[in-house]
């Protein structure tokens, strides 16, 4: 069967538009994830990941992910996929993070490694290609890391991208394009974008200060100068402090015992401070001298800053003080639209019901605490009333005793008489 040229081109176009999905993990097959993910044995006390949807969720099955389960631990877990290079194509890295433990200090990022990584020996110093995701530690660190390894050096972004710091699930997306531009999205909304060359110090600067240039000796940068015609008034100089004219020597002052009496000093009302001549515009002012720049001979453009020869492993290599973070919905692809759609079909579908469940739990907890508080107050009031009743009974007994004593004493006296 022969196909027409337009139809053939259309089919080829559809094939070309098909997204390449290099890695996708949603943990929808129970414990089978343990066959795909490898624990590092570099340290014997790495923390353990467990499969969990957490204390609250939008869908108990769909929201299951890898959860950190031990406090104050390093974690090192990774999954391998078919190696690929992003040369000539877009790279999209996406995943969800939920810090349901209200994290105080810990990482929520991922690392992409080359195929040479020994997964069973993965650790904090293992060389990676890209590190991306949220990192929180106290009030001072709440950022999204975007770190590229360029020629063996880890290069941090020059911008500060703030991460989400609540207890809900959030979608993090990094897009790296072959035109050396990038985009960072949180919850499918752009929070940062720009040029790799501009926002990271991969390359030496294009321009440098001309080493042969120097500011001319007669270059005057003073906008104002002292008025040469101005002079200090003759009566300007007055002492800052003077003896108090109203002070009097105490009548009982004994100079032989107390020494010579000196009046206390006070601020001089006529003191004017240091005299300075008035300022006038400098007729020789030339402005601030700007060091001329020249092309940096060490600068060489690199059209392939974005590109890596090998991506083959996604790893969770992080530290957490308080455990409970859940990682889910991992995706590595070359298609921005597909990643956005995948985010909407996963995080986007369950986010509202997740919040509803959390709100319901919070309300139930609030009511429980109110009931417990009410019960505690009632018990305290009952105890107070019981103590008060006991005191009243004691007082009544004391009164009766006193009355009996008063009645008995006169009778005894009469009998004795």
Swiss-Prot record:
Chain sites annotated for binding Ca(2+): 26, 62, 64, 328
Protein's GO biological process: ERAD pathway; protein folding; protein stabilization
Region (C-domain): 309-417
Annotated region described as 3 X approximate repeats, given as residue ranges: 259-297
Residue stretches in coiled coil: none
Positions bound to an alpha-D-glucoside: 109, 111, 128, 135, 317
Signal peptide location: 1-17
Region called Disordered, residue ranges: 193-277, 350-417
Pfam families given in the database record: Calreticulin
Region (P-domain): 198-308
Region (4 X approximate repeats): 191-255
Residue numbers spanned by region Interaction with PPIB: 237-270
Subcellular location: Endoplasmic reticulum lumen; Cytoplasm, Cytosol; Cytolytic granule; Secreted, Extracellular space, Extracellular matrix
Disulfide bonds: 105-137
Span of the annotated motif Prevents secretion from ER: 414-417
Assembly notes: Monomer. Component of an EIF2 complex at least composed of CELF1/CUGBP1, CALR, CALR3, EIF2S1, EIF2S2, HSP90B1 and HSPA5. Interacts with PDIA3/ERp57 and SPACA9. Interacts with TRIM21. Interacts with NR3C1. Interacts with PPIB. Interacts (via P-domain) with PDIA5. Interacts with GABARAP. Interacts with CLCC1.
PANTHER family documented for this protein: CALRETICULIN, CALRETICULIN AND CALNEXIN
Protein name (Swiss-Prot/TrEMBL): Calreticulin
Originating organism: Cricetulus griseus (Chinese hamster)
């Amino acid at each position: 069967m022969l196909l027409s040229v337009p139809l053939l081109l259309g089919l080829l176009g559809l094939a070309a538009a098909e997204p390449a999905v290099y890695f996708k993990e949603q943990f929808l097959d129970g414990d089978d994830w343990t066959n795909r993910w490898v624990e590092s044995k570099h340290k014997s006390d790495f923390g353990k990941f467990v499969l969990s949807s957490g204390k609250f969720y939008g869908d108990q099955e769909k929201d299951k992910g890898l959860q950190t389960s031990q406090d104050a631990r390093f974690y090192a877990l990774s999954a391998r996929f078919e190696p690929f290079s992003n040369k000539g194509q877009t790279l999209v890295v996406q995943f969800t993070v939920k810090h349901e433990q209200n994290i105080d200090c810990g990482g929520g990022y991922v690392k992409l490694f080359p195929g040479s990584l020994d997964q069973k020996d993965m650790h904090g110093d293992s060389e990676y290609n890209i590190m991306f995701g949220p990192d929180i530690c106290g009030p001072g660190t709440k950022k999204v890391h975007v770190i590229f390894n360029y020629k063996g050096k880890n290069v941090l972004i020059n911008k500060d991208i703030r991460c989400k710091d609540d207890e809900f699930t959030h979608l993090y997306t990094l897009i790296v394009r072959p035109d050396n531009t990038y985009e960072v999205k949180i919850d499918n909304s752009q929070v940062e974008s720009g040029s790799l060359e501009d926002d990271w110090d991969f390359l030496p600067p294009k321009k440098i200060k001309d080493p042969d240039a120097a500011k001319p000796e007669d270059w005057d940068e003073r906008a104002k100068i002292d008025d040469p015609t101005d002079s200090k008034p003759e009566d300007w100089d007055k002492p800052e402090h003077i003896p108090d004219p109203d002070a009097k020597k105490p009548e009982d002052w004994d100079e032989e015992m107390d020494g010579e009496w000196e009046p206390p000093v006070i601020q001089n009302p006529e003191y004017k401070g240091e005299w300075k001549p008035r300022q006038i515009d400098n007729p020789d002012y030339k402005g601030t001298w700007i060091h001329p720049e020249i092309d940096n001979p060490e600068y060489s453009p690199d059209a392939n800053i974005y590109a890596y020869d090998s991506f083959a492993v996604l790893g969770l290599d992080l530290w957490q003080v308080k455990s409970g973070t859940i990682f889910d919905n991992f995706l590595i692809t070359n298609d921005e639209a597909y990643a956005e759609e995948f985010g909407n079909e996963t995080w986007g579908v369950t986010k509202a019901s997740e919040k509803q469940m959390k709100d319901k739990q919070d309300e139930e907890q609030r009511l429980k605490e109110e009931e417990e508080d009410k019960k505690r107050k009632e018990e305290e009031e009952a105890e107070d009333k019981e103590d008060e009743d006991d005191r009243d009974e004691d007082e009544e007994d004391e009164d009766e005793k006193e009355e009996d004593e008063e009645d008995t004493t006169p009778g005894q006296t009469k009998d004795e008489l």
